Every structure is written in structure tokens, then in C-alpha cells.
Amino acid sequence: TGVQTCALPILMEYYSSHINKLIEQLSHLPGIGAKSAQRLAFHIMNMPKDQVEQLTSSITGARENVQYCKCCCTLTDREICPICSNDKRDHSVIMVVENTRDLAAYEKTGKFDGVYHVLHGAISPMLGIGPDDIKLKELMQRLAKDEVKEVIIATNSSLEGETTAMYISKLIKPTGIKVSRIASGVPVGGDLEYIDEVTLLRALEGRVDL
């Protein structure tokens, strides 16, 4: 046809080196491709300076001050998160989730009064993520010292989530603690954070013993 399309890296040579660096860093974020990174970069360039300063300050502040809860490993700005420090919660029931976003999804239902344990990932041999790469050791240490009656495994219904659920079940069963899994009403491969509250509640209420 005689028409050549310019690849994105070629177009980027016309940008300022600072803009290129910004685009490159933004493209490392999950779900952000090269074109989306460009749009975000130029949006940031058009933002008022005080808004840019607030954005960078918020990022730095979150990164420097947010830590793992010493009890459940969720992300918090306290040593012990508000849920774990709440005496009105049922500390004998622990729901295991993959990340803090999943914890938030179940909290929005307003129906779970137990506590959580956040793994910060799932076992994935394909990606080289093993049991030692997520917060499993912390979970087992917690079960050894706390009086826990039930562990509800609420990992995602992806292959990684199911693999993790089975692994956790095998670890916990010898302790005599009841282990259950949220019901299969959650779509296969679905991330809990994107599922509506009614579906999450039904999955919790319909949980099955492992």
C-alpha cells in the first residue's frame, strides 16, 4: 500500500525525555498499556501544578506510611487495622482473601462480622509464585496462637485461586479447625472486587466444607 504505520516507540522520540520517562513509568501499572500511559501522561501535564503536587504527595505518603497489619496482613496505616482491633468482631472466624480489595468487597456487604487474613497473592507455578511468596506462614502462625473455629477460604475462582484454596485446606485440616470455601456462585475466573454485593453474600452464605 505504500503506507507505513509508526510504532509507538518511534512516535515517542518526538516527546520530551521527561514525558517519555513518565509514560514509561505509567505503563508499568497493571492494566495500563502504552497508549493509555500516553493519555495519562498528557493529562497529568495539563493538570494544575498544585494538583500534580497533591498527587505525588499522596503517592509518596501512601508508600511511606501504609504497612501490613501485624495481625491480618491487610494494608493499613496502623500497627493493627481497625477490623482486627474491633472487639465486636467475631475473631473465631477468619476469611482468607487474596488482597485488600477483596476484603473491602466483602466489607461492603455489611454481613460478615468475622475477621480477615490477606494473602497478597495466590499460588501460581506458571508465574513462579509459591506458598512462601504469599502470607501463608503468617496465617498458620495466627491459627496456632488464636482460638479459631472456622477458616473461610474466599480466594478468587481462577486456577490460581482454586490451587491456593486447596493448598490452604490441606495445611489447616490437620489442626482440626473447620475449613470452608465460598460457594461457586462467583463466576469462574471472576475477581471478587468486581462482583456485586448480593452475589458475594450468597457465595458466603452458601459456603461448603472442604
Predicted regions and their residues:
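Short, small-residue-biased leader/transition segments that mark boundaries at the very start
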Residues: 1-8
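Long C-terminal interaction/binding lobes of large macromolecular proteins
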Residues: 140-152, 157-210
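Solvent-exposed alpha-helical segments within well-ordered globular domains of core cellular machineries
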Residues: 20-24, 38-42, 53, 57, ...
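Conserved phosphate/pyrophosphate-binding and hydrolysis machinery centered on Walker-type P-loop NTPases
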Residues: 30, 49, 62, 74, ...
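Extended interfacial segments that mediate partner engagement and assembly in macromolecular machines
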Residues: 37, 86-152
